[in-house]
Amino acid sequence: MASCGEVDHSVSSLPSSKKGSGDSACSGSSGSSPALPVPECAICLQSCVHPVQLPCRHVFCFLCVKGASWQSKRCALCRQEVPEDFLEHPTLLSPEELKTGGRGATGDNAWYYEGRNGWWQYDERTSRELEDAFSKGKKTAEMLIAGFLYVADLENMVQYRRNEHGRRRKIKRDVVDIPKKGVAGLRLDTEGGVQGSAAAGRGNSADGADTSAAAVQQAAAAPAATTVLSAPARPPTSLGGQPGSPTSPSLEDTLALLHISPTDAPERAEVGEGEEEATATPSMSSSPNTYADGSGDWSDDEGDGEAVEPREQRLRLGESLVDRSPPGAEASSSSSVRSRRPDGQCTEV
């Protein structure tokens, strides 16, 4: 390999005409900045289209970076993390080239794909491929966009992914200077410069199509609204098996439902084991289920505190309820009424 001295020596040995041309080229490069060579994209292995520079200073196509971001928010070369808002505010190496390509020459044709509330223009490379296939009379053309293979149906003027035919998007061929949203997912904002299509709060597909932020928020809020609406709204069940008020029933209301005077309130707390075991248990069995669901508002003195009273109160309560039975129902109730003896066994009265 030649050293630097040898290279300098070989250059100095050139004819004066050659040296003059070289000097003029150097002076021209110092006086005006020539067009930089288009860098190669390490993702698509082609020359970059709308090249963007990541914070790690690696350069890729904008759509290639967008397609890679669906897998991970990291650089494809050094694996350094890419900022979350990079696709919204990309660092373009040649923003003027994007604007020039978006305007084009009057009368030139360009290809567009349908977005939400407008049309997006394909990038220059894809437009050339579509125009070439269209001029040759081909029915379909394949395109590599953001790492995905798309098929353009030039007869029906739709595009779709090659492995997913269900989702179709309209395409069209029109003049280049029609109103449009942007080029290849990059918005042409005349006031604030060029922005990514996600800058307006949009979720973007791989090919640069957009979805409005309102639709995304509504879709995200729909499950929450459904969950709120689907909450059980049944009224709380009272101890007597009848619907109560939305608030916790008072002790007097509960006693009134059972036809017990307030003076017998201390004895009421133990209904369920003695006299009412055969009749009131079915209605009481639904109360624990209702309480477990959390749909009823139960006070502390009406739920779990029924099994802590002395046995004497249970006996007195059973006897008082037997005495208060209706006169006409003595014969029928005597066979079904039970009481608990001190030995813990239930016997018929």
From Swiss-Prot:
Catalytic activity, as annotated: S-ubiquitinyl-[E2 ubiquitin-conjugating enzyme]-L-cysteine + [acceptor protein]-L-lysine = [E2 ubiquitin-conjugating enzyme]-L-cysteine + N(6)-ubiquitinyl-[acceptor protein]-L-lysine
Gene Ontology biological process: positive regulation of canonical Wnt signaling pathway; protein autoubiquitination; protein K48-linked ubiquitination; ubiquitin-dependent protein catabolic process; Wnt signaling pathway
One Pfam family in the UniProt entry: WWE
Biased segments, Low complexity type: 10-21
Record PROSITE patterns: WWE (PS50918), ZF_RING_1 (PS00518), ZF_RING_2 (PS50089)
Residue spans, zinc finger RING-type: 41-79
InterPro entries found in the cross-reference section: RING-HC_RNF146, RNF146, WWE-dom_subgr, WWE_dom, WWE_dom_sf, Znf_RING, Znf_RING/FYVE/PHD, Znf_RING_CS
Compartment annotation: Cytoplasm, Cytosol; Nucleus
Compositional bias ranges of the Polar residues kind: 283-292
Region span, Disordered: 1-21, 226-251, 264-349
Domain text: The WWE domain mediates non-covalent poly(ADP-ribose)-binding.
Name used for this protein in its record: E3 ubiquitin-protein ligase rnf146
Organism: Salmo salar (Atlantic salmon)
